[in-house]
Swiss-Prot record:
Full protein name: UPF0173 metal-dependent hydrolase THA_544
Keywords carried by this UniProt record: Hydrolase
Pfam families, sorted: Lactamase_B_2
Family classification: Belongs to the UPF0173 family.
Matches recorded under SMART domains: Lactamase_B (SM00849)
Molecular function terms, GO-annotated: hydrolase activity
Keyword field contains Metal-binding: no
Species name: Thermosipho africanus (strain TCF52B)
Length: 223
């Protein structure tokens, strides 16, 4: 399994399929400018905020990708001309051709902003991909005891930037609860308001006996 970080909360997971998570490409100052997609099979959207739903409509149409998100976001995307959607909700799981996918709770918002309006975007969530390895992408979230139920996943991708999501201290509490084999930080240093010290997070993870891999935008790791 190959995991590529594309800045902010954007990740490309490659198994037998190519799975793109939270495709915030346009306007993302951390997206690697020389990166391009050759294929996208699935797009997972954790919630409706613009820095996560991002370019979902355009990419889904271009690559004929199936979008997986909560029911409300899938309904919204269908009205935007996205034909291939798979709605889920928190606690639900489904067996896809890449493996099993489970939607997990997240403590955040999910409103979709269009002009002066905020469209209800359902409940925010995260995803666990059970394929060659198990990968938990937390989405945007504060710390929650529900994370204990994910104990033992191979990889946990956690936000550490604070303000809107967990800060480093809370993210380390999440690491302690989940005890993944590997943790990868995300959602930090895109803008000043979510600045964080990733090396402090790495050091704290090591003290908890968990390997932390810090990826720069465009970098990949084989798990």
């Amino acid at each position: 399994m190959k995991i590529t970080f594309l800045g902010h909360a954007v990740f490309l997971i490659e198994t037998n399929k190519k799975i793109l998570i939270d495709p915030f490409i346009t306007g993302n100052p951390a997206f690697p400018k020389d990166f391009s997609f050759d294929k996208i099979d699935y797009i997972l959207v954790t919630h409706g905020h613009g820095d996560h739903i991002g370019d979902t409509v355009e990419l889904s149409k271009k690559y004929n990708a199936t979008v997986v998100s909560n029911f409300e976001i899938c309904n919204y995307l269908q009205k935007k001309g996205v034909n291939k959607v798979h709605p889920m909700h928190i606690g639900g799981s489904f067996n896809f051709d890449f493996g099993k996918l489970k939607m997990t709770p997240a403590l955040h918002g999910s409103g979709i902003i269009e002009g002066d309006n905020i469209i209800y975007g359902g409940n925010p969530g995260g995803f666990v991909i059970y394929s060659e390895k198990s990968v938990y992408h937390a989405g945007d979230t504060g710390l929650t005891k529900d994370m204990e139920l994910l104990r033992g996943v191979d990889v946990a991708i956690l936000p550490i930037g604070g303000n809107f999501v967990m800060d480093v201290e809370d993210a380390l509490k999440a690491v302690e609860m989940i005890k993944p084999k590997v943790v990868i930080p995300m959602h930090y240093n895109t803008w000043d308001i979510i600045s964080a010290d990733e090396e402090k997070f790495k050091k704290g993870s090591k003290q908890l006996g968990v390997k932390c891999i810090i990826l720069k935008p465009g970098e990949s790791v084989e798990i």
